[in-house]
Amino acid sequence: TRHKSTKGQEKMEAHKIIITGAATRMGAAIAKKLSGPDIEIVIHYNKSKASAENLKKKLTKNKTKVYLVKGDLSKENDLKKIITFAKSKLKYFDCLINNASLFENDNLKNFTSKSWNQHLDVNLKAPAYLTKEFAKNIRGKNNNIINIIDQRVFKLTPFFFSYTLSKTGLYTLT
């Protein structure tokens, strides 16, 4: 659900939020935008520990409760760890933002099984798994799942083959 902010922009009413890939770039920008008093955010990161810690310091200054969790989204045990951690801190969830993604260039002629599997695991399987677990830990009816995709889903090219296929799958999941 949404309400109007003082500047006339719509803001989410979610207070207990999980954001994957939130330590840098778009994920960090999303966390900053949603932060504020009475907001709790679980920030997932994989390799960007320093950035995650820096973001936590910034968000804490505006009274956001921030919890950091490291995890490799291509590993099912790490996905379970992220959900267990988030549940222990938040108790229940209002919003899941599947932002993290793997973005490596390949094409039909040079893709490898390893790259294919990594892209599908991080960009499609992890969001599907987290969505399933999110649904088990909600309260009420006003909950949000936001899956971040990009223009490559609609403007197909032969480049970033594995990425594009995984994000097209995520679009279908959405």
Residue ranges and their predicted role:
Residues N107-L108, S115-L120:
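Substrate-binding pocket helix/loop in short-chain dehydrogenase/reductase
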Residues N144-G169, T174:
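Catalytic loop of short-chain dehydrogenase/reductase
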